[in-house]
Amino acid sequence: MPELPIHPDGGREAPGYALERRLTRLEGLLPAARRRRAHQGLRESSVLETLRLTGADAAEKDRESPLFDGALEALALIETTASSGKELDLGLIREVHRLSSPPSGGEIRTRDLAPQFQNARILSPRFIESRLQNLLDWLHGDSGRGMFPAERMALWFPRFIEIAPFERGNFRTAHLFLSFFSCADGYPPVSLKFEEAEAVRGEVERAFLFDTGPLVQRFSSALGRAIEALESAGGEGA
């Protein structure tokens, strides 16, 4: 991994290195059955938080609802694709959006939208696909691959929300895809928490002005929570 500090501050170690060490310690120590159970719990937790963050509170009480099932299928597709080493592409984005935001068919929007975040500059529909492709090219290029997962998340999340490729459900799709960047580097699925919503809004608005530091820290904490869930699973029955 790169020697790329998240916040240059006189030599303090970047959080990404500490997370890597915790993940490495778990390799070979967590029995396969426990790992599978822990991963499934993280998937379900990520979907629930995604739906809560986007106003679908009822899904928390009904894990067999079509909305929950669709989002869980979308997250499984994200995890499988990322873990196989494939790159994130427009086709995957559209399919994940279709699964997680019914009745959308995954179509790119054809009309202008009003911004829902301060400092956001929503694109005209004719620029959406080219701007999305530019973002993906950067994330999968040499610079993007040289970043810690939390740093890639902090670039992806606000830019996708600002591009807003769909008429609705952009935040939901952006949030589900955070797990692409964690799973691509061997981490489990991740999610923000509903209780963080107000703070996250402010951090996203700062990121529109290229101040991504707070979001990097936020996503580092999310990765830490996911690893902690695996560590707890490893301690079961010890």
Give a label for each model feature.
Residues 1-238:
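FIC/Doc superfamily catalytic core
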